Amino acid sequence: MRCPFCGGPDTQVKDSRPSEDSSAIRRRRVCPDCGGRFTTFERVQLRELVVLKRSGKRVPFDRDKLQRSIDVALRKRTVDPERVERLVSGITRRLESGGEGEVTSEAIGEAVMEGLKGLDDVAYVRFASVYKNFREAQDFQDLLGTLGERLEGEGDLPEDGEAAPAPPDEVVAAPRRGRPARKRA
């Protein structure tokens, strides 16, 4: 493999191990010419997928683009990167093993929405607003209504097993942090 730093033709593998979910092999490499160190990931590709876009254009499937779109939806959300990687790998595997060499952009979008719905509600709404091209507030209200119905049907505990937040009328103000206020004389 060519060195990304100096362009040297050969690099040496120093360490090789499977990723957490065994969907990829992580390799640490070093360049003998410049001493640069970098990491590569090797993944199994079941078949070459072609994405059929809404415009009718055909483009090669890009796993990195899928990862980036999910990362954008999850920006500033505290979701474990391993869970995100499992989601991306699962969607990719499902698409590759679907039997068809071509997959529609709609099928990819629906798979991402389904995955985000189980991962993070805010990211789900963000992605849906772009994917479904929301134009007005009513579009958000409709989506939030279906999301609320889903949450009501799950019972008292959210998916992660933590206690549900208190309803707004039962919220108690948190104690102040820092030094206590001085009494004025």
Swiss-Prot record:
Coiled coil: none annotated. It comes from the Bacteria. Its cofactor is Zn(2+). Belongs to the NrdR family. Pfam families: ATP-cone, Zn_ribbon_NrdR. It comes from Methylorubrum extorquens (strain PA1). Residues 176-185 have a biased composition (Basic residues). Keywords: ATP-binding, DNA-binding, Metal-binding, Nucleotide-binding, Repressor, Transcription, Transcription regulation, Zinc, Zinc-finger. HAMAP family: NrdR. The keyword ATP-binding applies. Negatively regulates transcription of bacterial ribonucleotide reductase nrd genes and operons by binding to NrdR-boxes. One of its GO terms (molecular function) is ATP binding. The keyword Phosphoprotein does not apply. Binds 1 zinc ion. The gene is nrdR. Residues 12-24 have a biased composition (Basic and acidic residues). InterPro entries: ATP-cone_dom, NrdR-like_N, RNR_NrdR-like. Residues 1-24, 149-185 are annotated as: Disordered. A zinc finger (unnamed) spans 3-34. This is Transcriptional repressor NrdR. Residues 49-139 form the ATP-cone domain. GO terms for biological process: negative regulation of DNA-templated transcription. Transmembrane segments: none annotated.
